Amino acid sequence: MIKLTHISKVFQQGSRTITALSDVSLHVPAGQIYGVIGASGAGKSTLIRCANMLERPTSGQVLVDDQDLTTLSEGQLTRARRQIGMIFQHFNLLSSRTVYGNIALPLELDNTSRADIKKRVNELLDLVGLTDKQDAYPANLSGGQKQRVAIARALASNPKVLLCDEATSALDPATTRSILELLKDINRRLGLTILLITHEMDVVKRICDQVAVISEGKLIEKDSVSEVFSHPKTPLAQQFIQSTLHLDIPEDYAKRMSPEPTVDHVPLLKLEFTGKSVDAPLISQAVRRFNIDIGILSSQMDYAGGVKFGVMLAELHGDVQDGLAAIKFLQDHHVKVEVLGYV
């Protein structure tokens, strides 16, 4: 549905040349939710703006529904954009218009009849759960309600594609979850293709089918969400994944933790499980096989792309050599083991 091929974008700022995107290629299949994740300044927003030609690439090809947008005239591009909805971080609603009026605006600009506008707007109000807010103004809405209005407005022309530019970044966690569930529901019910950019792996984890990681304008990793979470290939992908698992070392442990082993201290381990290692009884097997004890301080498990993954903080008690053998056993079974210190 969306094919970006060898996209590069160069900006000139006085005598400076800034390369925002460098030879980026990705394919978003019809009906899928595709996430692009990266840190601030990585080129995410430039990439998504190239997808509907709000930003014209310096080089490369943009195909949406098999139509090459880079070859179109301004008039042709305006018509093509009717098949591409877009929502933004800051909603961009018209403060002088009601919820109904904001959603109706694209249809009015397209000279749709008043009866058809009313029918379509009422359908969209029902879809986004705002039937009781049609006469309200943006100033009287919460952030989540404003984004729901923006989503409804983006869907007014029955687009085949929805672009989401950091659509949940300005929202609190609970509201973020509700907006993500709405996007997932819209994708499922309408078969809508969604390309979203974000700096939060939690967003990717919750709703995306595939993910690409962008850094300094280059696409450094892309695959299904389950594959990236199970077998991240780049340090940046690993960093984003770790950010979704929030396990802190207890304060009393942190105070007494030593970076070097001593006689009366034991290793404090961070264990990361992905894929099949999550369900396997590896801890109990290691305890029995190597005559050690493992004291679990805390653990967390989650899902991404249908695959379970988890993290655990644990103390390792026993003979040093037995402990090293146990660590190797866990590593051989695809558990990432990190010695955080000695407590």
Swiss-Prot record:
Membrane-topology annotation of the record: Peripheral membrane protein
Domain of life: Bacteria
Pfam families reported for this sequence: ABC_tran, NIL
Domain ABC transporter stretches: 2-241
Positions bound to ATP: 38-45
SMART domains on file: AAA, NIL
Catalytic activity: L-methionine(out) + ATP + H2O = L-methionine(in) + ADP + phosphate + H(+); D-methionine(out) + ATP + H2O = D-methionine(in) + ADP + phosphate + H(+)
Gene3D superfamilies: 3.30.70.260, P-loop containing nucleotide triphosphate hydrolases
Coiled-coil regions listed in the entry: none
An example Gene Ontology molecular-function term: ABC-type D-methionine transporter activity
UniProtKB keywords: Amino-acid transport, ATP-binding, Cell inner membrane, Cell membrane, Membrane, Nucleotide-binding, Translocase, Transport
Annotated localization: Cell inner membrane
Main location: membrane
Enzyme class, spelled out: translocase
GO cellular component labels: Gram-negative-bacterium-type cell wall; plasma membrane
EC number: 7.4.2.11
The family this protein is said to belong to: Belongs to the ABC transporter superfamily. Methionine importer (TC 3.A.1.24) family.
Function summary: Part of the ABC transporter complex MetNIQ involved in methionine import. Responsible for energy coupling to the transport system.
SUBUNIT field: The complex is composed of two ATP-binding proteins (MetN), two transmembrane proteins (MetI) and a solute-binding protein (MetQ).
Protein name: Methionine import ATP-binding protein MetN 1
Phylogenetic placement of the source organism: Bacteria, Pseudomonadati, Pseudomonadota, Gammaproteobacteria, Enterobacterales
